[in-house]
Amino acid sequence: MRIDRLTSKLQLAISDAQSLAVGMDHPAIEPVHLLQALLEQQGGSIKPLLMQVGFDINGLRQGLVKELDQLPKIQNPTGDVNMSQDLARLLNQADRLAQQKGDQFISSELVLLAAMDENSKLGKLLLSQGVSKKALENAINNLRGGAAVNDANAEESRQALDKYTVDLTKRAEEGKLDPVIGRDDEIRRTVQVLQRRTKNNPVLIGEPGVGKTAIAEGLAQRIINGEVPDGLKGKRLLALDMGALIAGAKYRGEFEERLKSLLNELSKQEGQIILFIDELHTMVGAGKGEGAMDAGNMLKPALARGELHCVGATTLNEYRQFIEKDAALERRFQKVLVEEPSEEDTIAILRGLKERYEVHHKVAITDGAIIAAAKLSHRYITDRQLPDKAIDLIDEAASRIRMEIDSKPEVLDRLDRRLIQLKVESQALKKEEDEAAKKRLEKLTEEIERLEREYSDLEEIWASEKAEVQGSAQIQQKIEQSRQELEAARRKGDLNRMAELQYGVIPDLERSLQMVDQHGKTDNQLLRNKVTEEEIAEVVSKWTGIPVAKMLEGEREKLLKMEELLHQRVIGQSEAVTAVANAVRRSRAGLSDPNRPSGSFLFLGPTGVGKTELCKALAEFLFDTEEAMVRIDMSEFMEKHSVARLIGAPPGYVGYEEGGYLTEAVRRKPYSVVLLDEVEKAHPDVFNVLLQVLEDGRLTDSHGRTVDFRNTVIVMTSNLGSAQIQELVGDREAQRAAVMDAVGAHFRPEFINRIDEVVVFEPLGREQIAGITEIQLGRLRSRLLERELSLSLSPEALDKLIAVGYDPVYGARPLKRAIQRWIENPLAQLILAGKFLPGTAITAKVEGDEIVFG
């Protein structure tokens, strides 16, 4: 008989049977080998068919193993085996059955049917399972659905619905779907479209994360609960698994064949199945090769005739990009817009999901945490949508608490490491003989004993707290299971079981949970098992870098003493320091306008008075490093076209993909100090871009993404009016008026009006220069310390430096040059000459007109 008359699945099974025969040293391939191969075949139709008819698969496997063990074995096999006469006879019988059914190819199930007809050991084994041949034949007819086997791959296209879809209604019945809260209007609109006679295909369109897939799951739950019109009752909602449909389609036409078989099975169900296609845009162009038809075009006729009941889901951008281009496909769908829920709706959704997350993570989630998740995610995570981002916050915060429960608490871990360290040290000291070592060993032994007692006490507390937490989690899990059982009993109409669960089991479990909670009311020492607002705020801070967590005592003190800390770097300029400190305090106390930057300042004053230095000091205060500042030198933006560098080049221009210099920096660090240095040197068009930032705290880049500036402190520095400041030294009011005139002449009124505060820096006096000298020398000393050298200056040398470095016109910069010339240059020569070796204390004093070192 010709092998090419067998379906590809049967050919593979014969190949596996041959391998089995060779492996067991059998002389030929017997029908038993073939049935064993068919039974174990990946993705084969024989095992599901046998289970459907009522075969005991394990019993059949054992019988086959027994038969295989009884077959004769050969010594020194060559590895070459052929079909036995019994197997050839079986395949001929299957061939006759195929001809009777009008098949062009012999399929696996006909071999099984022929085996039951045989009066052989295999036939007896199959019939001993208590299943009649007639029952098997009926099951085969149902499997084939009246279709003939006219293709070698026909077996693979069978059971297409089981292979390429996921039954959402079944998952809803098993309680595996999360509850869907709200979204009634969207679900009602979806049902309304599904009830139409033709083009009854809704497509859910909305931003990523607004809950499009959840609406489909909500529809599945309503179908199961019978909360739908009669036209949808009893229907099944299947989600198409696009990955399974495409995966492994190696040859041309194989993908189309799979899709066609899926559509055929759907049409046979006569409208009893609704197909849910998530990421609908993937259907457009899927499987398209040279001369091939894509999935979207194959769906069109079925959609138009109403044979395919379909619910799609895709995002606005992808709908526009893929589906709107294909007008013929678009008109077959009816749009259902899914808007982002409000904060209140999100809170309701989170309350509905709370129990699922509590059971999964085995922790309690407080209502405060739910409200905080909705509010904080809405305010601080601007590039994602509710409710997805709020759910993620709850999930991650709960996961964090669970991780702490499962692993050793930090206190115990620290003690453990300390004990190991001390024990290693004591072992080393035991080898020493001198008195000092013995005394040290005694002290160490006492310390080890004390720490071991502390460790064992804490370990006991940890064990009891852990047991308490786990007990509560187990009861919660039982409550969740009982509620799922109650739903199943309600659907079946089992009133006895419903009464038992509703009035007996669930109230008892809830009472037990209350008792456990009452017992554990005292605050745990080591373990937290509740997700509160604080945990949510910590996760938001980790995601965005914005400090929204509750301030610790140390941070409050630091903020209250902010001016003092800034003055350690910035000498004088009290007005500017106070203005900046107030802006930061407003932001951290949560009192700043949520729709504007935390603070926007224009620093004016002559060169070298500390405008840029104050920004660096602020960045260091907030982030412990002055590198955390987004610094933009506005002198680089003197041309009109350079505006594009701030927000990104327009589409079609070089550099479009790179994004904007300012927008990208703030997207990466939404909580930062933005310094626009020498702002008056920029082209006037740059200020038009800044208007939006200063007023609304937002800026749209060239990609259409909105960048959030609400958590930034924006500082612009300028030298405008510095000549007037020098002329009017001592008269603050006249100085300010003159400077504001200069600013008004250069900037437009709408720009000046949007700045929170215009700060005029005073020229530096001799006293301030003395303070700055100490700071500059302190930096030099820290550099010398790396070489193990120290430096001290006599009062005369210090006065000399101040006298040389003081220039009211140029501020503190001449001082830096003076230190370089009088201190750093001669010191460098002396160090290189080898005069000062590591460990030397260098002193500088004045001799004549020079500063000398000794």
Swiss-Prot record:
Gene3D superfamilies, per the entry: 1.10.8.60, Clp, N-terminal domain, P-loop containing nucleotide triphosphate hydrolases
Residue ranges, annotated region (Linker): 341-545
Coiled-coil regions, chain positions: 391-524
Gene Ontology molecular functions: ATP binding; ATP hydrolysis activity
Annotated region (Repeat 2), positions in chain: 83-146
Similarity remark: Belongs to the ClpA/ClpB family.
Protein name: Chaperone protein ClpB
